[in-house]
Amino acid sequence: MTRTLRAMRQLGALLIVSVAALSPAAAEPTIIGDKNGEDVVTVRGVGTTQSKQKLPIFPGISGETAGATGLSLLKVVIPPGASAEAHVHKGYESAVYLIQGRVETRYGEGLKKSVVNEAGDFIFIPADVPHKPTNLSETEPAIAIVARNDPNEQEHVVLYAPDDARNE
C-alpha cells in the first residue's frame, strides 16, 4: 500500500469523525434514571466522539454516563481500510463482539502476532496487551461492541509505539 493511499485513508477516517461530530447525533446523550446506584439507567442518543486510538466511538455505559463503577460498554466503528492506533488498556481487560466486518488485530510485543476475526466473533484482550485492529474491507465499516472492566473507558488507554514495530 502506498503512503499516499494510506494518508488518504487516514484523512477519510478523520473526515468521518469530523462530520459525525457535527451531526445532531453528536449532542449530549439523554440519561434516563439517576446515577445514584439505585436506579436502572438508560443512555440514549449517544453521539460520536474520537477515541485516543483515533477511531469513532459511541460512548454508552461508563462512570460518566451511567454512574458505572466497574465497567464500560461502547460501540466502535473502524472506517473502511482504517486502523486504530496501537495501544494498551493499562490494568484492564477488554471483551469485543464484532457485529459487522472482518478485522485483523496485530497484538503482543512488537505487534508481531495477528488474528483475523469476522462478524459474530467474541474476542478477549487481556489487560496490558498491545493491540492494533485494522478493518480489512475497503468499502464497509467494521462495527463492534466493546466492554471493559474500566468505568473510565478512555482514561487508561496508552498509545503503544515500540521501537521495533512499524505501526502502519
Label every model-predicted segment.
Residues 1-12:
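Bacterial N-terminal signal peptides that target proteins for export
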Residues 11-21:
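Bacterial N-terminal signal peptides
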Residues 25-70, 85, 158-168:
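A short, N-terminal "cap"/entry segment at the start of jelly-roll beta-barrel domains
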Residues 68-73, 139:
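Extracytoplasmic
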Residues 74-89:
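Conserved short histidine dyad/triad with adjacent acidic residue
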Residues 83, 92-118:
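A short beta-strand-loop-beta hairpin characteristic of the jelly-roll/cupin
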Residues 85-86, 105-106, 114, 125, ...:
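Short beta-strand His + acidic residue motifs that chelate non-heme Fe in jelly-roll/DSBH
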Residues 118-119, 127-154:
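Ligand-binding loop in jelly-roll beta-barrel domains
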